[in-house]
């Protein structure tokens, strides 16, 4: 039954992932679902990703055409998101952190880093739809905050992560900078999300 469900989901994914508009509502929401739309690229080899650190925005572009845009969470000042030009080189739909997570002690769950001297079984935070662009740095599904909150990765909320995962491939260029030209034209249309009151998974 689980196999059939996954096959039906996989068959419906292209229609669900690639919609007809790059528009989103700029209103902020507190937790809950986060809807983004995406276009199917005409040539997947021309897809590129642009990240604005100052605006915490991700733009997936094909030339001047916006395929998808979404809010993101960037790294805290002590563990910043790296700047520069990169390429996606590893994708993993189901991934857990090898560094940050929990220690499970019977019925107790204690936040802990993997190497912490705390008893119990280590379980990493879920990082679904992982797209790695630099060793230990990637785009992945996770809570999105209005302020920097990650350990350097770029978090995408809910379906934004799944759609991003479908749009990029190994070799997709990624540019991460303080700002992007799209901040002025597309940035104001991006819906903000605030998961700051939501407990970590």
Q: How should these model regions be labeled?
A:
Residues 1-11:
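Bacterial N-terminal signal peptides that target proteins for export
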Residues 11-13, 80:
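Residue-level detector of transmembrane insertion/anchoring sites
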């Amino acid at each position: 039954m689980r196999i059939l469900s996954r096959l039906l989901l996989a068959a419906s994914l292209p229609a669900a992932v690639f919609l007809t508009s790059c528009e989103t509502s700029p209103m902020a929401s507190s937790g809950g679902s986060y809807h983004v739309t995406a276009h199917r690229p005409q040539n997947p080899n021309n897809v590129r990703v642009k990240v604005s650190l100052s605006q915490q925005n991700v733009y997936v572009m094909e030339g001047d055409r916006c395929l998808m845009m979404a809010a993101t969470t960037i790294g805290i000042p002590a563990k910043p998101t790296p700047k520069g030009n990169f390429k996606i080189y590893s994708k993993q739909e189901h991934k857990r952190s090898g560094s940050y997570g929990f220690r499970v002690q019977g019925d107790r769950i204690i936040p802990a880093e993997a190497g912490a001297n705390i008893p119990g079984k280590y379980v990493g935070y879920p990082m679904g739809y992982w797209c790695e662009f630099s060793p230990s740095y990637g785009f992945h599904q996770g809570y999105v905050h209005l302020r920097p909150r990650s350990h350097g990765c770029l978090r995408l909320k809910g379906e934004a992560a799944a759609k991003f995962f479908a749009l990029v491939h190994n070799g997709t260029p990624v540019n991460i900078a303080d700002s992007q030209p799209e901040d002025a034209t597309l940035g104001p249309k991006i819906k903000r999300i605030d998961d700051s009151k939501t407990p970590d998974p």
